[in-house]
Amino acid sequence: MKSNVEKFDEITGHIFAHLYLNFPVEMNFDYSRWGCEVDEDYWSDPNSDESRRKQRERDIIDATFRFLERSGYIIYTPTNGGYMNVTLTEKALLSLKRHPDSLTGSKTFGDVIAEAFKAGAQEKMKGAVGTVMTMAFSSITGGSL
């Protein structure tokens, strides 16, 4: 079972990949992207194991969106089934447009995250997301963690 931090990194990678590839167009994200939409099964038996699993996933997705907004990475409008008008902030775009020190060539963090997402390379995507978040935090704190 994945930890909440691993799920956060995957969800963040998914969000960043879509927003970076489509920037500046605002995107909509609903829970069905993660297989945890509220459907007829939920309403017929909200206490079933599957309904509870989907609710836990929605809680993590909601917390991820709130964290990314509060941290200044995204702007969005919440809806009952997800989020609409989601876009990257200037801070996020600048972070995603940076080039990793470990890479030679012209790929940016955004490119790495988007390519890893498309290829299903979860570990590579999570690593790039973690680096982007650390880099942005370090720039705010003057490089000290």
Set out the residue ranges of the language-model regions.
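Long, low-complexity, charged/polar intrinsically disordered regions in eukaryotic proteins
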Residues: 1-5, 138
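Short amphipathic alpha-helical interaction segments
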Residues: 51-70
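Short, amphipathic alpha-helical interaction segments positioned at domain boundaries
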Residues: 83-116
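Short, surface-exposed loop/turn segments at secondary-structure junctions
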Residues: 2, 78-83
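Short amphipathic alpha-helical interface segments
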Residues: 4-52, 59
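Membrane-inserting effector segments that mediate pore formation, membrane fusion
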Residues: 106-145
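A short, conserved structural fragment
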Residues: 66-80
